[in-house]
């Protein structure tokens, strides 16, 4: 990440965002120089206007007019060029800063675990990455120099006006305290309103995103009017929040505009009187009137700038909350070295056990400690595929009183197949999520190759334990690109096609007009459920995992295709450990161990033959699926 979000969580929003701006500070220095040039010209041009009136129009020195006008034109050109330059540099400054901020947000999202995404709406996350970051960009790129411009112009104009005529300037200055009181009131009331607008916009985005994703369900149930009504409610809430902000501005802006008009009235009235009395020249009055916009402009603009500043603060609060979110699944420090050491110990114990079992007495390994240390450092982290659940119980962190899994205890040797059956909600998907460490067990240990899953580096564990989830997701890419997503960078087309063949997808892919170059939507639009499942399986196989978890992966596939896939999986090299969750007996009957789950507990375990012979829950499921009556033989 570009900036550590936990460095100073109590810092103000402006101080918090500065580290993202730091690499572009030289650009800000350049913009500041152009800003000074622009404002110097802006403060000088009105003085020249007064000189022209006094020297040329009143004094009759017409020969000075070309020189003074030429000087004004030159200053105007310099001012326009300088203003364009610093505006472009500040825009680049804001864009670069937000680029780094969005990158950190996106990286943070990848660090967060399933618990966060289970309880955070997609629209809220999208608002953090889009509208909230744009509010920060707007503040850095535009509001920052507008505030500086207003302050410099206001103070600079007052100073010059005091130098021209202190009496008129003093009267104008007496109006400014009322301006600051009004702007303070506007700011105080605007802050909670902007925060409410941000929340309402996030809710609206979530609702729209949910409907776009579920548009097929909406159409299938003819719920368009209902969803439109829901959208209108969210949209109306967003409108009302914005109207509340508009009412707040309307309450203060007329007073601010009125004070701005009073400045012009005082200048013309009192200034005209002073000219008539001879206390100031007509040229000075013209200069005063030209400076007036530098007083009036900041007064009128202050209300809008305060609104933008409060929008910036509300957005910062939202983004900081995301960046400081703490993931529950955290990799231990020095996990790589710790696992290498643990692997060496496990291998040594196995070696000693084998030696003792063969001779009846311990046998020296013949390898020194230094040699073992060297081997450990050079040993690549590879998972063989042993899985052990040691009295594991689990409850979701936000509901610890409701256990999902209860005292699970079983072992799956490397290269074998585990089948899991159970009713919907029995905890099957949660069980396999513990293997990839998407969650940590509440009680007990999940051991991979004899090492606690919490000790493995997350990248190693998840790269070699691959889940083909129930909810198939395909990226907006070609079919080949979707399958290759799970493969290493050096995989070629032949490898991708081989994985598709194993998953039973090659034939239907080749039947498409563009074959593997066919582009599919993010949800696999245009593909059947079975085709999407087979592509997801091919993507997982392309990752060449040591442990392959199939979460009801072939539920939408016909029996013949499923049998072909099972055959190909058995023939694969490498001896993968396969964990198959299914509702169909045919998907798990060839497993070395079958678990039957009910309400988070293992109620039966064994091979297919053992469970059928036991005449228990598995036997009931088996006979119902085969369409048999209890005790009636049908040749199976």
Regions found by a protein language model. Name each.
Residues 2-7, 59, 95, 103-127, ...:
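Short intracellular "coupling" helices and adjacent cytoplasmic loop segments at the cytosolic face
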């Amino acid at each position: 990440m570009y900036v550590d979000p936990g460095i100073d969580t109590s810092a103000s929003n402006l101080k918090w965002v500065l580290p993202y701006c730091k690499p572009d500070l030289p650009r800000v220095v350049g913009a500041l120089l152009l800003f000074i040039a622009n404002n110097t010209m802006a403060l000088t041009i009105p003085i020249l206007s007064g000189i022209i009136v006094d020297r040329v129009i009143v004094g009759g020195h017409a020969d000075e007019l070309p020189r003074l006008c030429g000087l004004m034109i030159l200053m105007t050109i310099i001012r326009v060029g300088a203003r364009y330059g610093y505006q472009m540099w500040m825009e680049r400054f804001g864009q670069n800063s937000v680029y780094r901020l969005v990158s950190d947000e996106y990286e943070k999202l990848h660090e967060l675990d399933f618990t966060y995404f289970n309880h955070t709406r997609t629209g809220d996350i999208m608002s953090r990455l889009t509208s909230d970051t744009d509010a920060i960009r707007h503040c850095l790129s535009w509001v920052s120099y507008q505030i500086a411009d207003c302050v410099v112009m206001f103070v600079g104009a007052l100073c010059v006006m005091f130098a021209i005529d202190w009496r008129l300037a003093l009267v104008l200055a007496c109006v400014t305290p009322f301006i600051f009181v009004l702007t303070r009131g506007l700011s105080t009331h605007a802050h909670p309103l902007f925060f409410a607008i941000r929340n309402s916009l996030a809710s609206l985005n979530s609702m729209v995103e949910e409907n776009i994703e579920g548009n097929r369900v909406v159409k299938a149930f003819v719920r368009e009017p209902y969803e439109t009504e829901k959208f209108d409610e969210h949209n109306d809430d967003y409108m009302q929040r914005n109207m509340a902000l508009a009412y707040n501005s309307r309450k203060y802006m007329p007073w601010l505009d009125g004070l701005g008009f009073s400045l012009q009235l005082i200048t013309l009235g009192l200034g005209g009187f002073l000219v008539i009395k001879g206390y100031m020249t007509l040229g000075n009055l013209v200069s005063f009137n030209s400076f007036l916009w530098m007083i009036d402009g900041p007064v009128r603009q202050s209300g809008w700038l305060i609104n933008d500043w409060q929008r910036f603060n509300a957005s910062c609060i939202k983004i900081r909350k995301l960046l400081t979110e703490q993931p529950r699944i955290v990799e231990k420090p020095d996990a790589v070295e710790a696992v290498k050491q643990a692997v060496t110990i496990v291998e040594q114990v196995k070696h000693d056990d084998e030696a003792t079992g063969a001779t009846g007495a311990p046998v020296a390994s013949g390898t020194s400690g230094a040699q073992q240390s060297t081997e450990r450092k050079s040993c690549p982290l590879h998972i063989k595929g042993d899985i052990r659940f040691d009295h594991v119980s689990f409850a979701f962190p936000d509901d610890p009183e409701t256990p999902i899994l209860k005292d699970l205890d079983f072992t799956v040797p490397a290269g074998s197949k585990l089948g899991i059956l159970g009713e919907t909600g029995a905890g099957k998907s949660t069980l396999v999520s513990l293997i990839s460490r998407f969650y940590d067990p509440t009680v007990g240990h999940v051991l991979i190759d004899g090492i606690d899953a919490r000790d493995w580096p997350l990248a190693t564990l998840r790269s070699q334990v691959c889940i083909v989830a129930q909810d198939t997701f395909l990226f907006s890419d070609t079919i080949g690109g979707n399958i290759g997503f799970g493969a290493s960078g050096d995989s070629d087309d032949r490898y991708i096609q081989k994985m598709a063949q194993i998953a039973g997808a090659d034939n239907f892919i080749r039947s498409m007009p563009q074959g593997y170059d066919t582009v599919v939507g993010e949800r696999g639009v245009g593909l059947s459920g079975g085709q999407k499942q087979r592509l997801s399986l091919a993507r997982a196989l392309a990752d060449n995992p040591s442990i392959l978890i199939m979460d009801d992966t072939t539920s939408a596939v016909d029996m013949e295709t499923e049998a072909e896939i099972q055959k190909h999986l058995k023939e694969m090299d490498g001896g993968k450990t396969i964990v198959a969750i299914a509702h169909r007996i045919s998907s798990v009957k060839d497993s070395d161990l079958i678990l039957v789950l009910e309400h988070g507990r293992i109620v039966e375990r064994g091979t297919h033959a053992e469970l059928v012979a036991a005449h228990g829950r598995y036997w009931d499921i088996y006979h119902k699926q085969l369409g048999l009556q209890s005790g009636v033989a049908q040749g199976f």
